[in-house]
UniProtKB/Swiss-Prot annotation:
Organism annotation: Geodia cydonium
Any one GO biological process: adenylate cyclase-modulating G protein-coupled receptor signaling pathway
PANTHER family, per the entry: GTP-BINDING PROTEIN ALPHA SUBUNIT, GUANINE NUCLEOTIDE-BINDING PROTEIN G(Q) SUBUNIT ALPHA
Region (G1 motif): 35-48
Stretch list, region G3 motif: 195-204
Name the UniProt record assigns to this protein: Guanine nucleotide-binding protein G(q) subunit alpha
SUPFAM superfamilies to which the protein is assigned, alphabetical: P-loop containing nucleoside triphosphate hydrolases, Transducin (alpha subunit), insertion domain
Keyword terms, alphabetized: GTP-binding, Lipoprotein, Magnesium, Metal-binding, Nucleotide-binding, Palmitate, Transducer
Length: 355
């Protein structure tokens, strides 16, 4: 009997040892996971940033992956055309081309969400209207209505995109706009450390879901579209400036107790669009506290950065700002290398003991 008990005890001891070993391994692995929470208003560039992580630190986009975006590119183009044609009417801008109304009727009868090609008459109508001086005037006034940042990029390259053998490039994929709904996670590994990037919808209707992502966040990455200083929030009933909306949201986020121990990385995104826009739309016309020169993108972006950083006066943690262009892979690779090193240094003792 004693021999039997002894054998059972030895078996139980081996089982307990194995369980403890697995628990220790799981605990060690958990410490090697870094959770990065991407926040910001709608269209600030969060989803594009995720795509860049896939390109830089993941498997990238194969030809087959890119082909899956083909219809989305077509839909983005048609949605942009619909937005401009509706705005042309609302802004009472006249077309120059005598055949413009025929092209307008053809395009407005199409449903962007079902688009699978841009052939024949559709392509010709888009090309003619994009060349029309009235549509070009409407495009120049795009801050007065909602229009995708990728509109000019796609329409200027219409011959390539409308060809029968069209395969979207990686840049085409990066510029596709699909509103984020729900919670999307993208894990990737760097030096045996798992970075789990969490992207949530930025529209007002999506923000109530954010709280479900707030546990165990290593760093909050807040994206701001700095080119939106002269644009109005489409979701709002009143005319809310999109930059003001972003400032209010940032203030709310850094005040949450969940993030007291999290670093705050501020990505001041769309610096390329800001550089172009300040040449004809002046920051002082929308933010009277701006005291820099007109047509100076460096002064303008530094002023916007100060608006956000100054919100931090009541918070003990630091904010780490970076100017970015989310569609520029080299820029994002450089910036994220800096951010990654900062995150690893800040959390080195709890994330990777002994490193």
């Amino acid at each position: 009997m004693s021999c039997l008990l002894s054998e059972e005890e030895r078996l139980q001891k081996r089982i307990n040892t194995r369980i403890n070993r697995e628990l220790q391994r799981d605990h060690k692995d958990a410490k090697k996971e870094i959770k990065l929470l991407l926040l910001g208003t709608g269209e600030s560039g969060k989803s594009t940033f995720i795509k860049q992580m896939r390109i830089i630190h993941g498997k990238g986009y194969s030809k087959q992956d890119c082909l899956e975006y083909k219809n989305l590119v077509f839909r983005n183009i048609l949605m942009s055309m619909h937005s401009m044609l509706q705005a042309t009417a609302e802004l009472k801008i006249a077309y120059i081309d005598p055949d413009a109304q025929r092209h307008v009727q053809l395009l407005m009868a199409l449903r962007p969400e079902t688009a699978q090609s841009l052939g024949g008459e559709t392509c010709e109508a888009i090309r003619k209207l994009w060349q029309d001086a009235g549509v070009q005037e409407c495009y120049q006034r795009r801050n007065e209505y909602q229009l995708s940042d990728s509109t000019k990029y796609y329409l200027d390259d219409l011959p390539r995109i409308s060809s029968n053998d069209y395969v979207p490039t990686t840049q085409d994929v990066l510029r596709v706009r699909v509103p984020t709904t729900g919670i999307n996670e993208y894990p990737f590994t760097i030096n045996k450390i798992i970075f789990k990037m969490v992207d949530v919808g930025g529209q007002r209707s999506e923000r109530r879901k954010w709280i479900h992502c707030f546990d165990h966040v290593t760093s909050v990455m807040f994206l701001v579209a700095i080119s939106e200083y002269d644009q109005i929030l489409v979701e709002a009933d009143s005319r809310v400036n999109r930059m003001v909306e972003s400032l209010h949201l940032f203030n709310t986020i850094i005040s949450y107790p969940w993030f007291n121990k999290s670093s705050i990385i501020l990505f001041l995104n769309k610096k390329d669009l800001l550089e172009e826009k300040v040449m004809h739309s002046h920051l002082i016309d929308y933010f009277e506290e701006y005291d820099g020169p007109k047509c100076d993108h460096v002064s303008a972006r530094e002023s916007i950065a100060k608006m956000f950083i100054s919100i931090n006066d009541m918070r003990s943690a630091d904010i780490y700002p970076h100017f970015t262009c989310a569609t520029d892979t080299e820029n994002i690779k450089f910036v994220f290398d800096v951010v990654k090193n900062h995150i690893l240094q800040q959390h080195i003792t709890e994330v990777v003991p002994g490193l």
